UniProtKB/Swiss-Prot annotation:
Enzyme Commission number, as recorded: 5.3.1.9
Transmembrane segments: none
Coiled-coil regions listed: none
Organism: Heliobacterium modesticaldum (strain ATCC 51547 / Ice1)
BP-aspect Gene Ontology terms: gluconeogenesis; glucose 6-phosphate metabolic process; glycolytic process
InterPro entries, alphabetized: G6P_Isomerase (IPR001672), Phosphoglucose_isomerase_CS (IPR018189), SIS_dom_sf (IPR046348), SIS_PGI_1 (IPR035476), SIS_PGI_2 (IPR035482)
Lineage: Bacteria, Bacillati, Bacillota, Clostridia, Eubacteriales
Protein name: Glucose-6-phosphate isomerase
Length: 447
């Protein structure tokens, strides 16, 4: 199949890309020789080729059983433990897949929990689950991450009231550490089927592991094609030469733009089904690069919707923005605009044109307007909205992220900053061992 295409003609740095050849090669060597910071978490690099075939077969089998026995798969996880799966399911499924009758979708409905601490959301979720057959995939390497742990406590009790002990065992699947952790212990005690979160793959890079693959497969998506796309991308982006490696050209371009003061990168999509791909991308780049006082701030917009809210700022606000546009050569579905007898909206000049034709012209017009407004654009064109090309896209962004982090001079595979809010939250909640911090924090809060 054809590959993704990167167009830097509107990025304003294309002529300077060759100056990044040596830094790119150095970053490539750090990544591939596993000599860079965080190298113990680079298992994702070869994963599309070296993945565990036996576990993959178990994923397919479990997904078949979930689809056969359940109206709903409830996925419990946060961050990298759910964003990749949600991105894939939203991008590759019917826009209203959960609302379709079962006979018109290839998998069960997929709902999510454990990605917030909202009592209203969880209560509303139980309303939706009432009267339905449910399977659960709880995803947590440790089993102690606050949001999914709270959600799983509640969901587990609900499942135990609804089903017999044997049925609960058959319906709960735990994706967790191979040998240790609270969730692994609980799963072994209760007899839940378990899948492994690899030790050498961090959460935000884990979409092509069991973390992402089981929910994606349960939704009826072809995970063999997803991995095939990633595997072909792995081969295509193995050469460090900027002349042939689009993934590295993207990493080089965004770093050049950052050095020119473009501190905010907007992920731009013209399909609403890419909303959670944008969320996945934001975590990938934000957690990987935002440290040591450095990093491009990742944000996202959905056009044309956000042209009616953020368009003014992008066009004429602070000149700190760059855009990465993900677009498709071919829409997943198409409609033709009909003529209207009265032409009261003045749009008969579009009669006979497709809706996607209008969307593509919106893209072209916006591209030129933003470039004229000094917002550089990097364009990634994807041949089709399918599993194979999403696999390519996942790998493209993951590898570009690793290299980009090394170009920036940071460890792209850790996230030390996230511990600060957790310590404060645990102290304020009264977790044992945090008594001194609790008193100090409460003294700073409004009374």
């Amino acid at each position: 199949m054809s590959s993704l295409r990167l167009d830097l003609a509107y990025a304003t740095v294309e002529s300077a890309i060759s100056t990044m050849e040596d830094p790119i090669r150095q970053a490539h060597d750090l990544l591939h020789n596993r000599t860079g910071a965080g190298s113990e978490f680079t298992g994702w690099l070869q994963l599309p080729k070296t993945y565990d075939r036996a576990e993959f077969a178990r994923i397919i089998d479990a997904a078949d059983r979930i689809r056969a026995s359940s109206d709903v798969l409830l996925v419990i996880g946060i961050g990298g433990s759910y964003l990749g799966a949600r991105a894939a399911i939203d991008m590759l499924s019917h826009s209203f897949h959960n609302q379709l009758p079962r006979s018109r979708r290839p998998g069960c409905a997929v709902l999510f929990a454990g990605h917030n601490i909202s009592s209203a959301y969880l209560s509303d979720l139980f309303d939706i689950l009432d009267g339905k057959d449910v399977s659960v995939n709880v995803i947590s390497k440790s089993g102690t991450t606050t949001e999914p742990a709270i959600a799983f406590r509640l969901i587990r009790r609900w499942m135990e009231k609804k089903y017999s002990p044997d049925e609960v065992r058959r319906r709960i699947f735990a994706t967790t550490d191979r040998a240790k952790g609270a969730l692994k212990r609980l799963a072994d005690e209760q007899g839940y089927e378990t899948f492994v979160v690899p030790d050498d793959v961090g959460g935000r890079f884990s979409v092509l592991t069991t973390v992402g693959l089981l929910p994606i497969a349960a939704a009826g998506i072809d995970i063999t094609a997803l991995l095939a796309g990633a595997r072909d991308a792995m081969a295509e982006y193995a050469n460090p030469s900027l002349a042939t490696n689009a993934c590295y050209r993207y990493a080089a371009a965004r770093n050049l733009l950052y050095r020119q003061g473009k501190q905010v990168e907007l992920f731009v999509a013209y399909e609403p089904s890419l909303q959670h791909l944008a969320e996945w991308w934001k975590q990938l780049y934000g957690e990987s690069e935002g440290k040591e006082g450095k990093g491009i701030f990742p944000a996202s917009v959905l056009f044309s919707t956000d042209l009616h809210s953020m368009g003014q700022y992008i066009q004429e606000g602070q000149r700190m923005l760059m855009e990465t546009v993900v677009r498709f050569d071919k829409p997943r579905r198409e409609l033709t605009i009909p003529p209207a007898e009265d032409d009261s909206d003045g749009l008969n000049f579009l009669a006979g044109k497709t809706v996607d034709f209008v969307n593509q012209k919106a893209f072209a017009g916006t591209l030129l307007a933003h470039v004229d407004g000094q917002v550089p654009n990097m364009i990634i064109s994807v041949p089709e909205q399918n599993a194979y090309h999403l696999g390519q896209l996942f790998y493209f962004f993951e590898k570009a992220c690793g290299v980009s982090g090394y170009l920036l001079g940071v460890n792209p595979f850790d996230q030390p900053g996230v511990e600060s809010y957790k310590r404060n939250m645990f102290a304020l909640l009264g977790k044992p061992g945090f008594e001194k911090e609790k008193a100090a924090l409460e003294a700073r809060l409004p009374r």
